[in-house]
Regions:
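Flexible, glycine-rich active-site loops centered on histidine and acidic residues
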Residues: 2-15, 75-126
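N-terminal beta1-alpha1-beta2 module of alpha/beta enzyme domains
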Residues: 1-61
């Protein structure tokens, strides 16, 4: 059985030292993976860091723990760029990235991006 943990980004906010320390402690405890949330916006929430960028920071502070973003909203991003970012992070972390993609479920996020919520499935298939 593999057991991981979610990075409490809202609680740790922008404290880079605390984020690194949390990731290192998770690794030292033998947890298999560290999950980083993916949300473009969330009204009333604290910091919502971009997950691939945040995982690059974590990769530099750890050696073994698997890096797992929650499902990346692919239709909200440029697909080739996501592929390049993910491949780079995976290579630079020694193959520790586990990537999942999906279409998202919150219309508020697509509205904030000026994108059509209703054709997100078709955009993801492209």
């Amino acid at each position: 059985m593999k057991i991981g943990i979610s990075l409490p980004v809202r609680e740790l906010q922008d404290d880079v030292g605390a984020i690194k320390a949390f990731a290192q402690a998770a690794e030292e405890l033998g947890l298999s993976h560290l999950r980083v949330p993916e949300q473009i916006i969330r009204p009333g929430s604290g910091p919502l860091h971009e997950p691939l960028t945040l995982m690059a920071l974590i990769a530099g502070a750890t050696e073994k723990i698997e890096l797992v973003p929650s499902v990346i909203m692919l239709p909200a991003r440029q697909t080739v760029l996501v592929a390049k970012q993910a491949a780079t992070l995976d290579r630079m972390s020694g193959g520790r990235l586990r990537l999942g993609v999906g279409i998202g479920r919150d219309k508020v996020e697509y509205d904030a991006l000026g994108m059509d919520f209703h054709n997100r499935g078709a955009r993801c298939e492209e």
